Structures are given as structure tokens and as C-alpha cells.
Amino acid sequence: LAINFISLTEALMFAQLFPLMDKMGFDPKDLFEVFEDSVLKNWTSTFYTKKYMDREYKLDFALALGTKDLSYVKRMYEEYNVPAFVLDGALDFCRVALAEQEKGQPPIDMSYPCETMYHLLGMK
């Protein structure tokens, strides 16, 4: 759960950033290269930012399962009665993206929140 908390939260941060930078005029391919050439490069960043660059969200890990894992971690914080600041935002983002999933359709990928952000920014 600890690894999923870190990696999924990182994926969600990139999912939020790519559409915003695109709206501001930065080419997603250039942004991808910036991260690939930075100290932030790791397996998670490469795997997810490639999806965000291409706006292709092939199912590799279901968003519903990632949300469930993050919810388990949230309960751990609640057991100690302390806030989970970053986690709360990540869970909110996941829930907004999950609401876009149409009933009866295949599961959406953990990368789909990027597309949700594009929708929120008015970019189809």
C-alpha cells in the first residue's frame, strides 16, 4: 500500500499538470521530455507521462482499484485521527474521474484523470 500511495499520487500529480501546461501552450511532448531528462524521472513518471503525452489511457491498472488502495491508506490516517492532506486531494480527483465512467463500460485506467482534467479545463 505504501508503494501504491506514493506511485499513484505521483501519477495523479502529473495527470493534473499535463492538461494545465497544455492549456498554457506547452507541448505535451516537450513536457514529457523535460521530465524524462530530469531528476524526477522514474518508472512511474515515465509510464504515466507517456500516456498523458499521447492522451491514450489503455487499461493497465483500473482507476477503481487505485482508488480502493488509496482509500485503505486514508483509513490508516483516520485510525490515528490525523489529516491526510495530499491523499484527500488524490481521492477527490479519483472520484471526479470515476464519475465520468459510463455504466456498463469497461473499467477506466488510473491514467484517466488526465482526461478528466482536460474536460475541466474545457479542452476536449
Name each model feature, range by range.
Residues 120:
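Active-site/catalytic core of tyrosine-dependent DNA strand-transfer enzymes
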Residues 123-124:
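ATP-dependent carboxylate/acyl-activation modules
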